Amino acid sequence: MPGGRRTSRRTGASLPERLSRHLVACGAGLVLLQLAFRAWALSGSWFYFDDLAFMSRAMNQPLDSSYLLESYGGHLMPGGFLVVYGLTKAAAFSWVWWAAVLLVMQALAGVGMLRLLLSMFGRTPFVLALLTGYLSFVFTLSAGIWFAAGINQLPLQIALVFGLHAHLAYLRHRRVRSLVACLLWTAFGLLFYEKTLLLFGIYALVTVGWFSHGRTPERLRHVWDHYRTAVVSYTAVAGVYLAIYVHYGLDFSPGTSNAQPWSPIAWNLVGEAMSTALIGGPFRWEPLAVGSFADPSQLTMLVSWAAVLGVAVYAYRTRTISKRAWSLLGFTLLCNVALLASARANIVGPDIAREYRYQTESAALFVIGLGLAFLPLVGAPQVNRHREGVPFTYETPRLIASATVAVALAAAYSTSAYVDLWQDRNPSRAYFAEVRHTLEAESDRPVPLVDVGIPQTLLWAYRYPENSYSHVLRHLSRLTSYPDASTDRLFMFDDTGSLTPVRIPATRRDEAHLGCGYELKGSSTDIPLDGPVIGGGWWIKLDYEATSASSVRVVAGDDVHETELDAGEHSLYVSAEGEFDTLELSDYASDADVCVGSVTLGLPEPGRPST
């Protein structure tokens, strides 16, 4: 058995024996060490992209079924949206509380994995090696420092470790309470992430592989005869959830998976990302806007393939039923390839498979599979035994400990490199800090803003209106206003978050006139533009001079404004939408003596920063 064969020459207990006596304490120490590392990574992280959309939704929508059950990028996550709603109401844009939630979930997953490994393999020091791998691999890193990913992925990790623990307890003793516990943990995961549905496949593989016997038909008959209640319960829950997901969450066609070749996705997912992570890689990253893709060297890939294949072959040569141990990981990898082919890869291509957040469960399933490949599963009728007459060349405690430490240190290097890129390339914190600073620096508040979207480097425009100022900056509502008409003062933020006066580039102008241009007289005045206008998002800048103040009605296509013309020289800004080629002004005072000098229509842009 790995880590448990060699005894010390010195008097007293051997190192494996001492570790066995203090296994829980050592495991807890490893979990705390990982949490400290993740806390460091989170301390330099902040809200990014989908986090902003999540807060925008929570700040502007009521807490009802429409809010909770809305599909977000194909995700059905009412539990996640409920957590987001509570955090937003209590601590919008206060990162420390959101980071604390990620840490708590990571702690639960770590403790749950320790508990699961002890339940599966007993008090063997090899459990510590397995736990170290789970805690140090980069698979769960992006989910651990990016809230939008973590609120999906970490509940899946929790559901996996606690759900499988309960499922194994049911298989051993057939107690209904264990079955209920398994269903509750799985349902918990489903509230956050539809991919939790794959746990039913994992439960099935464990049941058929280790708690039945004979050929496949005999195994299936045995499962039905002995675990019928679980089969019916799991099928019912999975069927009901699948129907709910198809109704509320599915926003892509599974049939489109045939449009994207599977082989490049599988190569990126398994050959580049997964295999190199299992030896502590990938060591090298391809930076994106903020996140990073695995970008291992060819040497790293060759070493990882040799190491992974070598472990699998060695397990096969020294153990009696090691091959089935890899079925759990193989099942989820196959599902991941199919899911990426039907959704994400159709949009961004097969390189998306080099993003570890699409296979976070691989960390847990690899260490579980590694344990099953070498150790007997406690309480299972199918026992993984040593092959007679085969030497255990590579199972000394020193070798296992050295390999574990080497992988953990390598993973720490890969993790640090990823975190450095993540922390250095996220522009969100600086942008929103500058927004708040420049708004608070304005003496005349609330500041009138054009309600456009924040830069697409922070949140894509397809999330409109979630990306608009009025939604994302709802927490600053006391400092802002969003008029559809304003005199002289109208602002936007530039790409750095600095407050700037609006500039209206000339897409359309009034037809040229000498002198006054257009004098408001009679009951109404039409100002023709030099071309037709169609669509929305337009603003008009109307420069005028008036001897006295007057009310006025401005019709700009479908937008009608009842506003004021102040005395003196001013610029009036009004929004415009629809199909039109003439600006109509009416309902002004007959003695106002207003002269319109120029009219400019365009899509508003940031000007120079306000001083």
Which residues does each predicted region cover?
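Short hydrophobic alpha-helices at membrane interfaces in multi-pass membrane enzymes
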Residues: 169-187
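Intrinsically disordered, polar/acidic, low-complexity terminal segments
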Residues: 2-70, 74, 79, 92-98, ...
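Membrane-interface micro-motifs in multi-pass membrane enzymes
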Residues: 50, 77, 105, 120, ...
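Juxtamembrane "helix-exit" motif on the non-cytosolic side of transmembrane helices
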Residues: 41, 136-144, 212, 243-252, ...
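Conserved beta-strand->loop/alpha-helix structural units within folded catalytic cores of enzymes
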Residues: 86, 110, 182, 186-202
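Transmembrane alpha-helix segments characteristic
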Residues: 320-347, 406-407
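Transmembrane alpha-helices and membrane-interface helical segments
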Residues: 115, 162-169, 203-211, 230, ...
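Perimembrane helix-loop-helix junctions
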Residues: 198-238
